[in-house]
Amino acid sequence: MTQTFDPITLELLWRRLISLVDEAAAALVRTSFSTLVRESYDFSCIVTDDAGQSLVQATESIPSFIGTLPATVKHFLRFFPPDQLAPGDVLVTNDIWLGTGHLPDITVAKPIFRNGRLVAFSASTAHAPDIGGKIRSPEPREVFEEGFQIPPMKLMRAGGTDETLVTLLRKNVRTPDQTLGDLWAQVVALDLMEERVTALMDAYALPDLRALAAEIHGRCETAMRAAISALPDGTYRSELQTDGVLDKPVTIRMALTIDGDTIDIDYAGTDPQVDRAINCAMCYTYAMSVYGVKVCTSPTLPNNEGAFRPIRIRAPEGCIVHPQFPASGGSRMLIGHYLPMLVFGCLGQIVPDRVMAAYGSPMWGMNQSGVRDAMAGEPSKPYANMFFFNGGMGATLRGDGQTCLSWPSNVSSTSIEISEHISPLRFRHKRLRPDSGGAGKHRGGLGQEIMIESRSATPIAVSFLAERTIFPAFGIHGGSAGAPGVLRINGEAVDPKRQYVLQRGDTVLLATPGGGGHGDSTVRDASSLQADLRAGYVSGNETGRHA
């Protein structure tokens, strides 16, 4: 007999599940070693049912992992069917096509058993501080250049660690203590989720999670289908160009078809994959596409498998959003972060009040690799790290774009104090970019300007994640484009898709793009303009542009 739940019990169980993954996420942050997890929150924790279908995701998670993480658990099940799993096993991979689209993201999952029967998985993805290979940049031509590849395998068997894998990983990364420290922090999070899930099942006498999963998935699927059904049927198209590589832009095309209570997204006509590391694996394409649909149709709906069942994503094999092995993809967000904008371009034709102008993303980042000078009590040693810098969001019908906010990712920036402590870099300044937000009835969010100086006694290799230096974030409904991004080394403009070496005293200037404006700037509220002037968001000689 199928177990049923009254509304109150269902809500209690659902909220308990969300609470336990949030608790695991907090534990991961508190036990992690790298700033990418501890400060930037570049990770996710989920619980799935026994088939790998996501039930709940931690509240403060990376949006793309909503789509990639449960898919990876399903891939684990293909490699390790239930009869090949045991209590205490921990599965691991960073495979580009089975994971998140680039090697630095390490995914782990732990089967949860009850009375000898597989009932669920706890799982986590986290961005490792280093995964070996060439310093992360758009330059690698094949995945083999990008670092240490971990096929789907067991990190732990019945509670025992695969020391061979650990030794290989330690030998192949620049920051073994941080990389392995974060990996074990992920395992701690898995253990905590397992403990809390089994306690919840005991408290409510649940023999398994299938009935609960069916309720959660069914309700979210119904809600998403209802939201889609409220939209007019039809095929809507959009396309855009990215800065691309080697002075050649990349064109991405989308056709979004609404048919009753389903949405079909097709990337036919998109440019082919390239021999640079901006290729966006299908797993990431799927995740960014469904996320764009969700924020336009049902943004408050909890994230789980049911919410995405009515959405289908297709792309031709070999195009840049469905690259084939051995394509490189370490900088896949330089393509993937544009995909929600394409969804907005399609849905904005029928629900213009729900979309924003173009945003100043893909997010910017600065990768560094070198030798950190000896510090008090510590010898000099290799280091590798990454700092994120965000541009401005696009304006909407409701108001101005948010300033320096990461979207469609939601990573945080590492504080200057911590950044300077862990690296031989000095931040000369970090400030908002006046006049960078696109003019409009509602102004685009501002970008920021960061000046960094190398204080290292030895050379530092640096590379960047940077877009919208050629094509700025456009405005909509009469709004103006935001300011394009700027990247300079020692005052000279440089190609953001290349790797460089900094000597002591060299400086890097990163000026992130502003978001696009919304509506005619000539009807901007006078009080809003005066507030912008007082805050320094616009300058006196730019008032005409922002009036």
Each PLM stretch: what is its role?
Residues 1-87, 92-547:
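Glycine/proline-enriched, intrinsically flexible loops and inter-domain linkers
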